[in-house]
Amino acid sequence: MNQPAEAGVRLLLRGRVQGVGMRPCVHRLATSLGLAGEVRNTGAGVRIDLLGPPQALAEFERRLPDELPPLARLDAIQREPLPAGTRFAGFAIAASRDERRGALAPPPDAAVCPACLEELFDPHDRRWRHPFINCTHCGPRYSLIRRLPYDRVQTSLAGFELCPECRREYEDPADRRFHAQPIACPACGPRLCCEDASGRRLSGDPIERALAALARGEILALRGVGGFHLACDARNAGAVAELRRRKRRPAKPFALMAANPASLQALVELNENGLAELSGPAAPVVLLRKRPAADDLLAAGVAPDLAWLGAMLPHSPLHWLLFHEAAGRPAGTGWAAAPQDLLLVMTSANLSGAPPITGNAEARERLAGIADLWLLHDREILNRCDDSVVSALGRAPLVIRSGRGLAPLEIPLARGGPSILALGGQLKNAVCLTRGDRAWLSPHNGDLDDADTCRALERTVARLGELLGIRPERVACDLHPDFFASRFARDYAERHGLPLHPIQHHHAHIAATMAEHGLAEPVLGLALDGFGLGADGRLRGGELLRVAADGCAWLGELNPLPLPGGDQASREPWRMAAGALHALGRGGEIATRFAAEPGNAAIARMLERGFNCPPSSSAGRLFDAAAGLLGLGGRQRYEAEAALRLESRVVGLPERVPALWRIDDDNRLDLLPLLARLADMRDTRAGAELFHGVLIEALAIWAARAAEATGLHRVALGGGCFLNTVLRDGLCARLRAAGLTPLLARRAPLNDGGLALGQAWAVLLAADIPSTRGQA
């Protein structure tokens, strides 16, 4: 049978298909094949109408998945016949339609591409040293989108009218900036300026002034892609110390920005995973193991007393221009691959605990007394996005914080269901929205102990829902009723008349790992973190669970230790060590071992009387107790400092470890014998290695027994303690050796930043989980 000379088809592309150069890509492919038709953004994705010979239509569908733009991700193609009588004169990019038939993913921001860098450093190019250069393959996306479909009028560039040259590029199908929505140049784009501490705008080149301030040891506030950064010379001990003092951040490690991997070579070990993460379009902060020379080459205050360093490369043209200026403004990009002397501390511009600042006026007000110079511009940041953080320390990279370049993080789910709004936890808060078989995890909001972060959570819920066009049908939150996120969830559910699903903390941790792996079948779950409220009202932090569609069943926990002074023990690890000594019958040693700690005698009496010493199975507090016994933790200056210092002491693990644990009849794993051994050790490295080695072996045996009892052989791991590389990689290897399959979330954070995904998945797995209308 002869084929018709002409046929028509309509394709709907779903996935990351807007803001990534998909329409220009479709235009080029269609015109190269002689097809007529049009392509347009819609609220559901990208719609393509094609008319032409059947062979050419088939060739288009065959080639499209292999010729996608670098930032695109194609999840599905919906195909239907073109309406009869449809005619086209050539192929065109048509005006967008704001229809909402399916959730559309807002694209994350992307680091500067090589082609834009070539132009940025070419003195003969009209965008030479233009701090807002971008194209369809790179630049800001999520941070400047007001709403979808993704068009210039829906972004913070709407007020910048294109000059004739930019308009020509924008309309030229052969140009890299064909329909690049944030397109800009020195003639028509945003403007950069410098202001001093008095708010006076300074004359001269802003980049030159900024670099001069850094060279003088001053602190620079610069408006980045998703928020402001504070920067100083990472080799200048005085500047780093002053930044710590002004920011009220006494010890928490700072991130380091270098021009390229060659500039990091002497400081950190660059493995394949680390290089890929550093140089990828997300350009996150990457945790890399320090080389011995790092502490001599950097100011002592950059990342004190830790075995790793958080490093990143310039991700925006503005950051790149600081390094270009320091190199003497060379022509071309050859210098950009060579080692450069400039190393910068680059940290979020906020007071510790508060969200990053996004607006110029807010920066002037809130950073007064912190920054010496402000590098500002007038491209508004509509959606705050802190830097993403990725660990490249272990066998495979994993996300610690999802932000700029990664978020909103889209996770395909193994099944669909009602749309869920999940509010996450109190710490490292992020929210999750679902529609059908897709979940979107928001950028990191932060800790909800801060009022500004609480307001950021409220804005995130509104903005992400608006961008995705999702109206939640159910609300999920943590079981703890006093968390701000839980109170917000309760209020939201009441206002909208929606069912509320409180999900136990560790259940959510395990469900997040299941969601990422597309699992609806039962698994063993091992959750290790600081604490979560159990269904019985007790504080738990180390639990063995069976998690399935019908809910979460308790299988065992770490043997509880007393928390002298309650939550204060999480800030003073010596208290946990004192609690361990008391539990070992060695309370008489507390006063002498911790003579330098105020209140040591009072803590000993509290333990003797059992007053204000609630028991907790927290794995995080177990690490604190071990660190305290080894003299590594008096008072924590930031969260998990003692545990991080303990991990940093590990060079290798013992080949064989003594059985310094017990498993009782109630399946509680008791590690007091291990703590007793640590209490008598003076070698901190040997003690840290023994602690990790015994803990890994004990957890593996505990999980293997549960696997034998339940018949389940997949072990989902969750909770912030698994950010410990020694524990994570060691336990996974030991579980595999025992014939079990360990599962880890690597895209969603293992810590509380992934809780919202787990809460949403727990609700989707079991629509019959008992819920209340606005009551937790």
Curated annotation (Swiss-Prot):
Residues 8-95 form the Acylphosphatase-like domain. GO terms for biological process: protein maturation. PROSITE patterns: ACYLPHOSPHATASE_1, ACYLPHOSPHATASE_3, YRDC. It catalyses: C-terminal L-cysteinyl-[HypE protein] + carbamoyl phosphate + ATP + H2O = C-terminal S-carboxamide-L-cysteinyl-[HypE protein] + AMP + phosphate + diphosphate + H(+). Its EC number is 6.2.-.-. The keyword Zinc-finger applies. Pathway: Protein modification; [NiFe] hydrogenase maturation. Disulfide bonds: none annotated. It is an enzyme of class 6 (ligase). Keywords: Ligase, Metal-binding, Zinc, Zinc-finger. It comes from the Bacteria. InterPro entries: Acylphosphatase-like_dom, Acylphosphatase-like_dom_sf, Acylphosphatase_CS, Carbamoyltrans_HypF-like, Carbamoyltransferase_HypF, DHBP_synth_RibB-like_a/b_dom, HypF_C, HypF_C_2. Belongs to the carbamoyltransferase HypF family. Involved in the maturation of [NiFe] hydrogenases. Along with HypE, it catalyzes the synthesis of the CN ligands of the active site iron of [NiFe]-hydrogenases. HypF functions as a carbamoyl transferase using carbamoylphosphate as a substrate and transferring the carboxamido moiety in an ATP-dependent reaction to the thiolate of the C-terminal cysteine of HypE yielding a protein-S-carboxamide. This is Carbamoyltransferase HypF.
